[in-house]
Amino acid sequence: MPPKFDPNEVKVITLRATGGEVGASSALAPKIGPLGLSPKKVGEDIAKATGDWKGLRVTVKLTIQNRQAAVSVVPTASALVIRALKEPPRDRKKEKNIKHNKSVSFDEIVEIARTMRFKSFSKELKGTVLEVLGTAFSVGCQVDGKSPKAVQEAIHAGEIDVPEE
């Protein structure tokens, strides 16, 4: 027999979900079924929580305590960069490997870096900004009309100042 269920125990499950969509509850079932939760209801909660991330893949953190699931969205750097581009959501099933060609301002990149600070391994905000610029390069967008690589080189050369925190 499995051990008795402790109502005060907190379980944390992280999974990737597409924003605004109810994922296949069959994928959720093995993870949350043993905890006494309905996969269908949790799937709807995830869809509600990821509503403003329509069409983007985001990491979702499920905190389960006392048979209640709290859903929180942990956005990735690429999701934040794409969101900053303010492009309309595209159909993921039809278009694969989308290259984004709009431009993001450097101030928005710094704001994204501040948001991502808790996940970054860098010591200073400057390092996190460089990480986000690398993500912007892989997404295929520009920063203030220039290539993210050129902006990175300008930061290394000291031409662009990154604020301390």
UniProtKB/Swiss-Prot annotation:
A Gene Ontology biological process noted in the UniProt record is: translation
What is the top-level taxon of the source organism? Eukaryota
Report the locations given in the UniProt record: Cytoplasm
Residues annotated with N5-methylarginine modification: R67
Q: Does the keyword Phosphoprotein apply?
A: no
> Which Gene Ontology MF annotations are present?
large ribosomal subunit rRNA binding; structural constituent of ribosome
Q: Specify whether RNA-binding is a keyword of the entry.
A: yes
Q: Which UniProt keywords apply?
A: Cytoplasm, Methylation, Ribonucleoprotein, Ribosomal protein, RNA-binding
Please provide one cellular component term from the Gene Ontology annotations of this protein: cytosolic large ribosomal subunit
Please name the PANTHER family in this protein's record: 60S RIBOSOMAL PROTEIN L12, LARGE RIBOSOMAL SUBUNIT PROTEIN UL11
Q: What does this protein do?
A: Component of the ribosome, a large ribonucleoprotein complex responsible for the synthesis of proteins in the cell. The small ribosomal subunit (SSU) binds messenger RNAs (mRNAs) and translates the encoded message by selecting cognate aminoacyl-transfer RNA (tRNA) molecules. The large subunit (LSU) contains the ribosomal catalytic site termed the peptidyl transferase center (PTC), which catalyzes the formation of peptide bonds, thereby polymerizing the amino acids delivered by tRNAs into a polypeptide chain.
Q: How does it assemble?
A: Component of the large ribosomal subunit (LSU). Mature N.crassa ribosomes consist of a small (40S) and a large (60S) subunit. The 40S small subunit contains 1 molecule of ribosomal RNA (18S rRNA) and at least 32 different proteins. The large 60S subunit contains 3 rRNA molecules (26S, 5.8S and 5S rRNA) and at least 42 different proteins.
Per the record, the similarity remark reads:
Belongs to the universal ribosomal protein uL11 family.
Q: What is this protein called?
A: Large ribosomal subunit protein uL11
Give the originating organism.
Neurospora crassa (strain ATCC 24698 / 74-OR23-1A / CBS 708.71 / DSM 1257 / FGSC 987)
Source gene? rpl-12
